[in-house]
Every structure is written in C-alpha cells, then in structure tokens.
Amino acid sequence: MPKMKTDKGVAKRFKKTANGFKRKQAHLRHILTKKSTKRKRHLRAKCQVAKSDVPAIARQLPYA
C-alpha cells in the first residue's frame, strides 16, 4: 500500500500539540492602520483549532 500524502498547505499552517492543533490567527496581514494596537497584539497570540475541525486536519496530516 502506498504512503499517505501530507497536505503541505495544512502542514505549514498547523502544528500538532498534546491537546490538538495550534494555529495563527487571521486579520494580521494587511490593512493594519485602522486596527488598534491592542487588537493587533491579541491577534499575534496563537490559538487552538476548534474541536469540530480537528478530525479534518488530522486526516490531512497523517504523520503529525
């Protein structure tokens, strides 16, 4: 049986942790002048993937 392929786009965006997957938050790439410093600071923090999305990500990362 051939090896399963890892989805490289998903591999670059998500990292496996003991409790699931961590990811970077969105809305921090452009149009930043209208966003407050506080909002941008909070968006820098990593967050957990929702429990309902974990099975889909796990399927795309078979060796994570």
From Swiss-Prot:
The keyword Ribosomal protein applies. Keywords: Ribonucleoprotein, Ribosomal protein. InterPro entries: Ribosomal_bL35, Ribosomal_bL35-like, Ribosomal_bL35_CS, Ribosomal_bL35_sf. GO terms for biological process: translation. One of its GO terms (cellular component) is cytosolic large ribosomal subunit. GO terms for molecular function: structural constituent of ribosome. NCBIfam families: rpmI_bact (TIGR00001). PANTHER family: 54S RIBOSOMAL PROTEIN BL35M, LARGE RIBOSOMAL SUBUNIT PROTEIN BL35M. Belongs to the bacterial ribosomal protein bL35 family. This is Large ribosomal subunit protein bL35. It comes from Shewanella sediminis (strain HAW-EB3).
